Amino acid sequence: MSEQKTIPTAPAPQVHGLRPVETAARLTGWALLLAGLGHVLRAVWEIRLWTAGEPASGPPDQGEGVHRPLNSLENSYHLVTFLVGVTMVICAVFFISWMWRVRDNSVALSRERPKYAGFWVYLGWVLPVANLWIPRGVIADAYRKSVPGRKLPAVVTAWWALWVFGMACGTGLIYRDSADKLIERAYTGVWPLLFSEAAMVAAAVTGFLMVRAVTAAQTERVASLTAQPRAEG
């Protein structure tokens, strides 16, 4: 009775230039959710300001460099706004690190030059007008080069649309308001702020799903290329 032995075939091909991305993706996902939680918290404070109503002494910023003393609710809003800023910085650091990795991996997998030069991973977020499409473009290009022929997930476009909407209608691309000005807006017209916060929370959640989808597609492609084939003999 003969025994059947498993004999390894030729070694699987190696893909040079790949960078580990799973841990970066997990950290980025949690950072996105943390940033979303920060916007939920700030929305709660904006509702509290709106329901409390503006004090008889007027808004905190009274013009011509004059600022009245803040009450306790306004002081706490400053703290919440600071915490939101911290979560956004943390999220930006992890997100850009993840973008670099998926972009580099897409080059390693496709052996093609990326559509956008490396400096756009940073500058694409801060240059006016360019920041309306380049970050999404970098991710979309990395996805298409990683898994050619596969349709771009709808969550990529949904995430980006929500991000741009939230920034444009709230405190980002159009408005450059201080915390005192935001307090004044919460007193006099809170709804645009709440729409912005809701969009940013939705962008954080869809961003979390987007990072998972892009990373999963890339890691599946890597696994299919580097799997060790075996033959029975």
PLM-predicted stretches and their roles:
Residues S2-L73, F94-L123, A130-V164, C169, ...:
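Membrane-interface extramembranous regions at the lipid-water interface
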Residues T81, G85, N105-S106, V190:
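Generic signal for short, ordered secondary-structure residues
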Residues T188-A198:
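Membrane-interface transmembrane-helix boundary segments in multi-pass integral membrane proteins
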